[in-house]
Curated annotation (Swiss-Prot):
The family this protein is said to belong to: Belongs to the methylthiotransferase family. RimO subfamily.
Protein's recorded name: Ribosomal protein uS12 methylthiotransferase RimO
GO MF annotation terms: 4 iron, 4 sulfur cluster binding; aspartic acid methylthiotransferase activity; metal ion binding; protein methylthiotransferase activity
Organism encoding this protein: Pseudomonas aeruginosa (strain UCBPP-PA14)
PROSITE patterns referenced in this protein's UniProt entry, alphabetically: MTTASE_N, MTTASE_RADICAL, RADICAL_SAM, TRAM
Length: 440
């Protein structure tokens, strides 16, 4: 008589990099015959992959762990907040195991201890696709090229959670990308903590892919990915000089003309306190040069307002810089002290919460006007759109300017499309974030 198939519940919190970690754990569990179920009550054990980047993320992680314990009782915790095991166990002493990020084998071992895998052959194993388990829609996937970061930004604790930069061999990355494309993926989203630094730790070592030598470096990786005939989108690009090397690839249509490049601030004084590159004038000149080479370039960035020591003059400098930069997509966060971050020891004057809120609102209104004006320029133009979903009201897609989850959408007036379709459309309307279009 066969034993019941062991069942695992899984909750993945945080950024796309954590999502890739979840995919890796789930792939291993599926390979061992575990069934992944969508509810707490149907699971033999629940794994929660946490986020620990800022206090609100930690609070959400603790809340979800509590829900899983209440609904199921058997909970294993992993991910970035796992480095603070004492905090987790203080709030939830009944968790069965706590592991940090990237500790895939420890998670799987902890699952084994609660509910062992079946010893006889499980037909579920035969259903695991060659590209592994993916938590994204079939037509796009995140491609993680490295782990960790060599920077010491004073507001950030990622190096203490995920360690120094460790780049994946470029041959492994390209082989994974190839499997994804063969499985029907039409957009590869390249992610890491620092995409620009890819290969630095390996001294840009030459690896091999399909018998051909390829250097472990961002430009060469992008050139190889561009040969696969799918959209390739770069995320988390630190503003190193070598970013200039990939702009011509975008202009030539080999990469999506899209840069996700976190500038964080513009005031030289604030950037210095953040331990970020403080060359804001040169950055403006580079942005201008990038757009001269690739006029279609979309630039997304993130900023922090209310960093300790930020004055009204610093903030106004940032707004003026935004006016000059004319960025397309921008996210903004109010500074929140993070336990263990070097910024806590700088001795700078904290910005009051009400001032942070006021600056955030002014920042968002200022940038919203810029984004709306830039989107308005697209009305009447024809663009290619990748469809994400379709319902009775029409299709929802994205252009080269729109990454999933964080950017806007293109609403297409058609119910004849399906997710994964690439279509030409004409833009008919725009607001601050989204576009409306008709099929060409």
């Amino acid at each position: 008589m066969s034993t019941p198939t062991p069942k695992v519940g899984f909750v993945s919190l945080g950024c796309p990099k954590a999502l890739v970690d979840s995919e890796r754990i789930l792939t291993q569990l599926r390979m061992e015959g575990y069934e992944v179920v969508p509810t707490y009550e149907d699971a033999d054990v629940v794994v929660v992959n946490t986020c620990g980047f800022i206090d609100s993320a930690k609070a959400e992680s603790l809340e979800v762990i509590g829900e899983a314990i209440a609904e199921n009782g058997k909970v294993i915790v992993t991910g970035c907040m796992g480095v603070e095991e004492h905090t987790i166990r203080d709030v939830h002493p009944s968790v069965l195991a706590v592991t940090g990020p990237q500790q895939y084998e420890q998670v799987v071992t902890a699952v084994h201890e609660v509910v062992p895998p079946k010893t006889e052959h499980n037909p579920l194993v035969d259903l695991v696709p060659p590209q592994g388990v993916k938590l994204t829609p079939r037509h796009y996937a995140y491609l993680k090229i490295s782990e960790g970061c060599n920077h010491s930004c004073s507001f950030c604790i990622i190096p203490s959670m995920r360690g120094k930069l460790v780049s994946r061999p470029v041959g492994d990355v390209l082989s994974e990308a190839e499997r994804l494309v063969k499985a029907g993926v039409k957009e590869l989203l390249v992610i890491s903590q620092d995409t620009s630094a890819y290969g630095v730790d390996l001294k840009y070592k030459t690896d091999f892919w399909n018998g051909q030598p390829v250097k472990t470096r961002m430009k060469e990786l992008c050139e190889a990915l561009s040969s696969m005939g799918v959209w390739v989108r770069l995320h988390y690009v630190y503003p190193y000089p070598n970013v200039d090397d990939v702009i011509p690839l975008m202009a030539a249509g080999k990469l999506l003309p899209y840069l996700d490049i976190p500038f964080q601030h513009a005031s030289p004084k604030v950037l210095k306190a953040m331990k970020r590159p403080a060359f804001e004038d040169k950055t403006l000149a580079r942005i201008k040069q990038w757009r001269e080479i690739c006029p279609e370039l979309t630039i997304r960035s993130t900023f922090i307002v209310g960093f300790p020591g930020e004055t009204e003059e610093d903030f106004q400098y940032l707004l003026d810089w935004l006016t000059e930069a004319q960025l397309d997509r921008v996210g903004c966060f109010q500074y929140s002290p993070v336990e263990g971050a070097p910024a806590n020891e700088l001795g700078l004057e904290p910005v009051p919460d009400e001032v942070k809120q006021d600056r955030w609102e002014r920042f968002m209104a200022h940038q919203q006007a810029i984004s709306a004006a830039r989107l308005q320029l697209k009305v009447g133009k024809e663009i290619e759109v990748l469809i994400d979903e379709v319902d009775e009201q029409g299709a929802v897609g994205r252009s080269w300017a729109d990454a999933p989850e964080i950017d806007g959408n293109v609403f297409v007036d058609s119910d004849e499309l399906k997710p994964g379709d690439k279509v030409r459309v004409r833009i008919t309307d725009a607001d601050e974030y989204d576009l409306w279009a008709e099929l060409v």
